[in-house]
């Protein structure tokens, strides 16, 4: 089970991973918080493993979740995560929210990572670097506090790395929207400053490279 946290791009990364893994395996996607109902795979709203198994007979990728009060969104499945972990070859969980902003800091109750998750991938949008903390970050006051900068200061690679290091929430960092020479330079700088493996690229273009 892999949990995906961080800034904007989580749903896109989840789909990219699901599409790749589905070439040779069954993949279950879900959320531990809220996510938009995917239109690219069957959605099981019945909280039963039998319903998930039936869906896998029709598609290698299945989404499981319950309808919530927000139109067009799903909540977590009505099943124990341990049971879900055994329902597919791979389970991908969107475990965070960022209000479509490229970067974020996490409050005490975030992210909502299932205890049985074996890997946590954090998404950071390189387009947030250079913007002010107040404009680029979800929970900007907390981000500024962890980075040791004013909330109106620009986000630098050093500030981003400081927040990621202080939180210590992820196993792998994925830097998204790296689509120019300048963006690659910034991504490489972030990779130099963090202690975890780093993959960077553009989900939109289907390009990526391992930087660390």
Give short role names for the model-derived ranges.
Residues 1-4, 59-71, 95, 146-148:
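Short, basic, glycine/proline-bearing loop/turn elements
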Residues 4, 27-32, 63-66, 91-95, ...:
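General beta-strand structural signal in soluble alpha/beta enzymes
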Residues 7-8, 32-34, 96-97, 176-178, ...:
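Short, ordered loop/turn segments at secondary-structure junctions
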Residues 58-62, 86-91, 119:
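Loop/turn-to-beta-strand initiation segments
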Residues 71-87, 96-196, 211-212:
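Conserved catalytic-core segment of NTP-binding enzymes
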């Amino acid at each position: 089970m892999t949990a995906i946290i961080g800034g904007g791009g989580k749903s896109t990364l989840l789909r990219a991973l699901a599409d790749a893994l589905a070439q040779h395996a069954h993949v279950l996607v879900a959320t531990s918080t809220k996510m938009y109902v995917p239109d690219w795979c069957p959605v099981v709203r019945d909280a039963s493993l039998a319903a998930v198994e039936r869906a896998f007979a029709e598609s290698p990728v299945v989404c499981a979740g319950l309808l919530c009060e927000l139109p067009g969104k799903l909540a977590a499945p009505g099943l124990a995560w341990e049971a879900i972990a055994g329902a597919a070859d791979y389970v991908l969980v969107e475990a965070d929210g960022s209000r479509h902003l490229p970067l974020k800091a996490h409050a005490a109750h975030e992210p909502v990572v299932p205890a049985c998750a074996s890997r946590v991938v954090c998404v950071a949008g390189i387009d947030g670097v250079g913007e002010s903390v107040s404009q680029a970050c979800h929970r900007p006051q907390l981000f500024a506090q962890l980075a040791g900068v004013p909330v109106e200061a620009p986000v630098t690679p050093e500030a981003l790395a400081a927040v990621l290091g202080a939180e210590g929430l992820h196993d792998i960092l994925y830097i998204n929207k790296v689509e120019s020479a300048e963006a690659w330079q910034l991504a490489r700088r972030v990779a130099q400053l963090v202690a975890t493996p780093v993959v960077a690229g553009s989900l939109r273009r289907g390009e990526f490279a391992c930087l660390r």
